[in-house]
Amino acid sequence: MKHAENEYLNLCRHVMEHGTKKEDRTGTGTVSVFGYQMRFDLSKGFPLLTTKRVPFRLVASELLWFMKGDTNIRYLLQHNNNIWNEWAFKSWVESDEYTGPDMTDFGLRSQQDEEFKVQYDEQMELFKKNVLEDDDFSNKYGYLGDVYGKQWRAWKTTAGETLDQLKDVIEMIKKTPDSRRLIVSAWNPEDVPSMALPPCHTLFQFYVADGKLSCQLYQRSGDIFLGIPFNIASYSLLTHLIAHECGLEVGEFVHTIGDAHIYTNHFEQVEKQLAREPRPFPKLTLNPDVKSVFDFEMEDLTIEGYDPHPAIKAPVAV
């Protein structure tokens, strides 16, 4: 039987073979295709990729952060999650209050210049310490703008009110499961200019059939090597959590990507991953005593039987 991970591996192959060379906002360069869809049957294992290690702890803590409506990286740092650091760090080193060494193009330079990397690591550690310990600093530089959590839980209306999209869609799944309006959007055009990184995963929709909950994500932009594996696991986890609260089984996670791209400095890593054979997907177990999705904490989520190939490191484009 074909392993479900081939949905992702075939995406990698397709883009490497047929992608168009494009410049991008970060100056790194990509090959990309427009419009691609993957499907994962969540009843047949949790799609945490096995051809390289994907850190479930980071996926889960980021999702819980989104679900809390939080937009400050302090919560993430408190859970040893550093995946959003670079975007917040950028706002600090570009501010008038920053007096350290020049950090221009720190993402690329830290990969190419060992002497600079020492300085970068020192400044990043100082930044993290300040976010964790200094409330004023955290409020100013740990804040990412009205990113995912804010849009999910407190979307601002023109009437000056807020909409809790996530809470509302869960209630709709319970009361009107056949609705075609089971949608949450993170793309708020008015707020996009103020965001550290405008939403890449922009809109998701739920679908209930035969007692199963499925989810489709529309992702406007997908970093195939670093980002997409996280997104697959994150929205699969979200589907499990909401199905749990609504008394449903899990169905499919359908992942639709607009600009699906591989950065030019990830080619070697992608080839290395494609040379590996997938292993069985792990099993996700949720604490049955937790009834609401908003009450889950890290200790309530368990992954069993995860035996991936080793991690493959790659630079992030900021």
Swiss-Prot record:
One Pfam family, short name? Thymidylat_synt
> What name does the UniProt record give this protein?
Thymidylate synthase
**Organism (species):** Bacillus cereus (strain ATCC 10987 / NRS 248)
Instruction: Please list the residues that make up the active site.
Output: 200 (nucleophile)
- Keyword set for this entry? Cytoplasm, Methyltransferase, Nucleotide biosynthesis, Transferase
Return one Gene Ontology term, BP aspect: dTMP biosynthetic process
Q: Which residues bind dUMP?
A: 25, 180-181, 220-223, 231, 261-263
Among InterPro entries, the record links this protein to: Thymidate_synth/dCMP_Mease (IPR045097), Thymidate_synth/dCMP_Mease_dom (IPR023451), Thymidate_synth/dCMP_Mease_sf (IPR036926), Thymidylate_synthase (IPR000398), Thymidylate_synthase_AS (IPR020940)
